């Protein structure tokens, strides 16, 4: 998933840095001498993979980089880290970010520098040459702030040193407070509005610049800047209230049940293996009951394995009914969002949110979800009917309740896939997967990964691996990926992609005029700019001028290398899916190198941004990609594809149920953010019960409070449909562009040139229309949404492909 942050003038702010890239020759020499001077490099295990890659068209010099990368990741002595003996530097090679105390100083200097630029923009009205630069200067302002805010966002979550984490948090909050001021800065808004209303200036802007102008305008108006003063003040109050309620909602989710103990009768557990409870529970309560916490793993275990239906029912009711506190907070949040939308003249929060998304309106989203549900429901209902047959055989009743799902899903799997599956992990070493990804990107887009040295002080943990992304046509580094791969105490457990620096053209910056045109007696003097994130940039990228190089961080929580596996980190299949997914985001950032910070890479519509990452999941299971990627960590032998097919057939057995549940949740999200939330009698539990009766596969449960654990209602309010939407698009792109020849450079170039390179600087509907040669969807109207709904999610075709190979 993408990291989601607070923003400045934009709904998806990312971080930027100054990272000076050492020469290719120096990096390769240093990497070799530092890591391999004590022993020779053995590559015989990967000969089969290298031979296959060379046969498919990977250049020998590129494959040499892959051999080094694999050795780094699959040998314990290096942990994937290449450390230079060079001169110490600061975090991310920012020389003046060497200690935690430097963070707030950097933020303070950045704020002063931004104030100059704000004054310059505010004074642009009446000066045609300055008006023509307003959009670029707003983008530069956003880039300045994001350069510190998003770096701080990463460091406060990733840095193991609490001093650094606290300092990053202080800098983050300091600049976010200023960011909130800018979002309601009327003079900035007036300058932008003047640009858009002055036709000769507006039409002189490039397509990208016009897109950025509209983005800024929408974000200003979403902040209520066009409202009368008293309504604007109310808008700010509601926005603050929404943030407070959202944090409280998430806090209640994670800690709200920790002090709630419920006694669970032990006689209901007869017939199931309770040895897993022995040390923790039965030792403390040897007779009539055991203490359980709502939502705990113990209750989930009971739901899945207890033969007694009363045990399963009780486990469900303890976890998903009666938790009124988070539901009360959620309903306050939903009502505050409704009131906020009404202030801006919209009928609902969903209407306000979707205006700049591909879907456009709540009605379009609901139509899309209904089409998906109609296609998915028959398959899911057949599965529930089989659950009923299994239940009738065991219990004498064929009525499947919601608390029966996990138990009979397990029974269903045992019936259809009774044999033990051979493990995949021996073929899924971290080194093999990374080199396979790099080979895939080289064949598709002409880019590959090369391990690079890090200077002392550059990274936040010794295990962080730095990768250069190298383009064959430019023979140069086009971006950097820092990989923080292994689990550790205090590190977030989920995978994420952080954009640390966006692409932006910098040779057109006339920063010397900021002081001349923005200086004010009210501002403190700016002694220098050496503490700011000045970026020298690079030429190339298929465009004129100098650009910031994109930099991203890929964060996962994989198990560290195991000496029992020869020092290799062996992944589970789910880990590989995660890595492919997140690398889809990373490559979007690398290729989406635009002139403007606000539309580069993954800075595009929420319901479009997952397309490249979901498309990567299609590549992952293709035989030709598996041949590039999965090889035994000891012998180098390729993963037998039939072995993977059996695994996938089992894994996807319940896809119909899971997909139907996602459709239901996306529909619930739309209901909660509709005008219903403004009704005095609004009840989120009643809405959930009504939706279950309308669309659900199981009888509804009265007074359910499950929605109090649906955390995405805060972070993805009114946009939870996006993942399903992009699944449908990705399935179509795979089928139309890649399925016949997955490793085709022609297909890769087509996707790169029509989609990836534009970031968010072009209409997603226009990009898709050109990519798929489907003119009827270019306008993104109701018909286009219906077309995508009718495309479906593609899983039936995938399952048929798997079955055909078995």
Swiss-Prot record:
Its main location: mitochondrion. The gene is OCT1. GO terms for molecular function: metal ion binding; metalloendopeptidase activity. Zn(2+) binds at residues 581, 585, 588. Its EC number is 3.4.24.59. Cleaves proteins, imported into the mitochondrion, to their mature size. While most mitochondrial precursor proteins are processed to the mature form in one step by mitochondrial processing peptidase (MPP), the sequential cleavage by MIP of an octapeptide after initial processing by MPP is a required step for a subgroup of nuclear-encoded precursor proteins destined for the matrix or the inner membrane. This is Mitochondrial intermediate peptidase. PANTHER family: MITOCHONDRIAL INTERMEDIATE PEPTIDASE, PROTEASE M3 THIMET OLIGOPEPTIDASE-RELATED. It is found in: Mitochondrion matrix. Binds 1 zinc ion. Its cofactor is Zn(2+). SUPFAM superfamilies: Metalloproteases ('zincins'), catalytic domain. Belongs to the peptidase M3 family. One of its GO terms (cellular component) is mitochondrial matrix. InterPro entries: M3A_MIP (IPR033851), MetalloPept_cat_dom_sf (IPR024079), Neurolysin/TOP_dom2 (IPR024077), Pept_M3A_M3B (IPR045090), Pept_M3A_M3B_dom (IPR001567). It comes from Malassezia globosa (strain ATCC MYA-4612 / CBS 7966). One of its GO terms (biological process) is protein processing involved in protein targeting to mitochondrion. Residues 1-29 form a transit peptide.
């Amino acid at each position: 998933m993408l990291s989601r942050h607070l923003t400045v003038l934009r709904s998806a702010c990312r971080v930027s840095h100054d990272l000076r890239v050492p020469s290719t020759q120096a990096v390769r020499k240093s990497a070799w001498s530092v890591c391999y001077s004590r022993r020779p490099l053995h590559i015989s295990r990967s000969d089969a993979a290298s031979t296959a890659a060379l046969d498919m068209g990977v250049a020998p010099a590129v494959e040499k980089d892959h051999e080094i990368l694999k050795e780094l990741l699959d040998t314990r002595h290096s942990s994937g880290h290449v450390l230079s003996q060079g001169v110490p530097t600061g975090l991310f090679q920012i020389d003046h970010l060497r200690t935690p105390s430097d963070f707030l100083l950097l933020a303070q200097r950045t704020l002063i520098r931004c104030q100059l630029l704000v004054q310059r923009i505010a004074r642009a009205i009446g000066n045609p040459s300055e008006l023509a630069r307003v959009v670029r200067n707003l983008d530069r302002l956003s880039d300045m702030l994001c350069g510190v805010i998003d770096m701080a966002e990463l460091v406060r979550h990733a840095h193991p040193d609490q001093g650094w984490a606290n300092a990053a948090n202080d800098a983050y909050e300091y600049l976010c407070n200023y960011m909130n001021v800018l979002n309601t800065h009327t003079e900035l808004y007036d300058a932008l509005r003047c640009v858009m209303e002055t036709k000769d200036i507006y039409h002189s802007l490039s397509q990208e610049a016009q897109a950025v102008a509209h983005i800024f305008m929408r974000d200003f108006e979403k902040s209520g800047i066009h409202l009368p003063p008293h309504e604007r003040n109310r808008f700010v109050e509601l926005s603050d209230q929404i943030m407070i309620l959202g944090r409280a909602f998430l806090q209640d989710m994670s800690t709200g049940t920790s002090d709630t103990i419920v006694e669970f009768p032990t006689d209901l557990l007869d017939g199931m293996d309770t040895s897993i409870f022995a040390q923790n529970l039965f030792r403390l309560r040897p007779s009539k009951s055991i203490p359980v916490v709502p939502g705990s793993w113990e209750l989930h275990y009971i739901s899945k394995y207890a033969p007694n239906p009363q045990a399963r029912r009780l486990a469900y009711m303890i976890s998903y009914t009666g938790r009124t506190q988070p539901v009360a907070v959620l309903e306050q949040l939903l009502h505050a969002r409704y009131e906020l939308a009404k202030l801006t003249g919209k009928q609902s929060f969903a209407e306000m949110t979707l205006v700049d998304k591909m879907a456009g309106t709540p009605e379009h989203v609901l139509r899309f979800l209904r089409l998906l549900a109609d296609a998915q429901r028959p398959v899911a209902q057949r599965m529930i009917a089989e659950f009923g047959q299994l239940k009738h055989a065991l219990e004498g009743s064929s009525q499947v309740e919601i608390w029966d799902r996990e138990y009979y899903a397990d029974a269903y799997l045992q019936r259809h896939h009774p044999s033990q599956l051979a493990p995949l992990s021996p073929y899924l070493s971290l080194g093999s997967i990374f080199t396979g990804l790099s080979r895939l990107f080289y064949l598709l887009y002409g880019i590959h990964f090369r391990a690079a040295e890090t200077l002392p002080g550059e990274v936040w943990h010794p295990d962080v691996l730095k990768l250069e992304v190298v383009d064959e046509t430019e023979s140069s580094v086009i971006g950097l990926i820092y990989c923080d791969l292994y689990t550790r105490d205090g590190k977030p457990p989920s995978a994420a992609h952080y954009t640390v620096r966006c692409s932006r053209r910098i040779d057109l910056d006339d920063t010397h005029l900021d002081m001349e045109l923005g200086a004010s007696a009210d501002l403190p003097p700016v002694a220098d700019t050496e503490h700011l994130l000045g970026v020298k940039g690079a030429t190339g990228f298929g465009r004129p001028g100098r650009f910031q190089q994109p930099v991203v961080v890929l964060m996962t929580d994989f198990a560290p290398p195991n000496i029992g596996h020869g020092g290799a980190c062996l992944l589970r299949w789910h880990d590989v899916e995660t890595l492919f997914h997140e690398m889809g985001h990373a490559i979007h950032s690398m290729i989406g190198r635009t002139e403007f910070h606000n539309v580069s890479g993954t800075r595009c519509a929420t319901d479009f941004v997952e397309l490249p990452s979901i498309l990567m999941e299609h590549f992952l299971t293709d035989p030709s990609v598996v041949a590039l990627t999965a090889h035994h960590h000891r012998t180098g032998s390729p993963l037998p594809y039939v072995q993977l097919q059996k695994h996938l057939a089992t894994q996807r057995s319940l896809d119909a149920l899971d997909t139907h549940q996602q459709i239901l949740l996306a529909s619930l999200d739309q209901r909660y953010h509709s005008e219903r939330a403004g009704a005095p009698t609004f009840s989120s539990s009643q809405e959930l019960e009504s939706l279950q009766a309308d669309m659900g596969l199981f009888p509804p449960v009265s007074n359910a409070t499950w929605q109090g654990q649906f955390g995405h209602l805060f972070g993805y309010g009114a946009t939870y449909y996006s993942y399903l939407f992009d699944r449908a698009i990705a399935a179509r792109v795979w089928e139309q562009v890649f399925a016949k020849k997955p490793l085709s450079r022609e297909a890769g170039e087509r996707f790169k040139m029509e989609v990836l390179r534009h970031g968010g600087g072009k209409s997603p509907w226009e990009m898709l229309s050109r990519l798929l040669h489907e003119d009827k969807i270019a306008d993104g109207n109701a018909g286009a949404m219906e077309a995508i709904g009718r495309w479906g999610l593609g899983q039936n075709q995938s399952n048929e492909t798997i079955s055909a190979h078995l």
